[in-house]
Amino acid sequence: MNKVVLLCRPGFEKECAAEITDKAGKREIFGFARVKENAGYVIYECYQPEDGEKLISELPFSSLIFARQWFVVGELLQHLPPEDRITPIVGMLQGVVEKGGELRVEIADTNESKELMKFCRKFTVPLRAALRDAGVLTNYETPKRPVVHVFFIAPGCCYTGYSFAHNNSPFYMGIPRLKFPSDAPSRSTLKLEEALHVFIPEDEWDERLANGMYAVDLGACPGGWTYQLVKRNMWVYSVDNGPMAQSLMDTGQVTWLREDGFRYRPNRNNISWMVCDMVEKPAKVTALMAQWLVNGWCRETIFNLKLPMKKRYEEVSHNLAYLQAQLDEHGVNAQIQARQLYHDREEVTVHVRRLWAAVGGRRDER
């Protein structure tokens, strides 16, 4: 199997293709990307027959920015007979996947494909039973085995393949299913909530998103991101010249600082989180984030970078490289991840976690 399907936001196929071509090439897994505008997916076709599995095994999925999900596939199955779509699919997967732990029958995130969603849900149950009978799936779901993917691009037309549970998105179609909280000040709250699900393992939430932590929200008005921090019982300094939602102020957990987020400097040294969703040029935001991290003003940060109209992958890569260079120069060891989230539009969300730093002659364990 030499093809890898990458699901992405419709309209960002070129960025997804540029990224996978770049990062696969750096691992000497060469191929070319098949791109269809606004399709919501890209197919990276490797030149060597076994390189598809090698790619999804060796390249960390967490290192990808524009892909929501990925899986290796074989040839396209076309003209599936309406009276029996299951048999050809089972035949394609037998001998390819043995004892998969989960089945996902998926589509691209486009209006055209959404017409297939109802069919996919109904089709999953009988297909799962047939795959279990054939030994392609285990008799029970398990996260320790590969995930089997059946990806419909049109009625009676699908790719079949698999991904590795330890190196994929745990979410169906790569999209966390979140509900907008009715008491949140703005829909932007879903961006930060999704970022927390994507970047922080669930079993680490109690430690890294703990009650009583101190946090800063730069460019906070009206409080969509502050809302997520308050919901997790943090004390929040919300920095913005614009007003905060009264419902947040009434909690007693929010201190509104009427200042410019680019000029604000914290006056305490125990800030766990800094979040930022300001409409500004990516380079300016990245420089500010580097300043916070280099100076140890926070332990973790999540921030958004607004994208230009052209060369968006190059722009993000340049800013992430600058951030990494600044951290390296100042002896800060950190983990950096970036992802275009489902709730992002013309932007990407970046998460940075300081691990430790040598600052002013002392080792600062973080």
From Swiss-Prot:
Coiled coil segments of this chain: none
One biological process term in Gene Ontology: methylation
A single GO molecular function term of this UniProt record: S-adenosylmethionine-dependent methyltransferase activity
E.C. number(s) listed in UniProt: 2.1.1.186
Active site: 306
Keyword Aminoacyl-tRNA synthetase on entry: no
Compartments where located: Cytoplasm
A Pfam entry, by short name: RlmM_FDX
Catalytic activity: cytidine(2498) in 23S rRNA + S-adenosyl-L-methionine = 2'-O-methylcytidine(2498) in 23S rRNA + S-adenosyl-L-homocysteine + H(+)
GO annotation, cellular component aspect: cytoplasm
UniProt keyword annotations, A-Z: Cytoplasm, Methyltransferase, rRNA processing, S-adenosyl-L-methionine, Transferase
Binding sites annotated in the UniProt record for S-adenosyl-L-methionine: 188, 221-224, 240, 260, 277
Function of the protein: Catalyzes the 2'-O-methylation at nucleotide C2498 in 23S rRNA.
NCBIfam families reported for this sequence: PRK11760.1 (NF008734)
Family in the record: Belongs to the class I-like SAM-binding methyltransferase superfamily. RNA methyltransferase RlmE family. RlmM subfamily.
Subunit structure: Monomer.
Name of this chain's protein: Ribosomal RNA large subunit methyltransferase M
Designated gene of the protein: rlmM
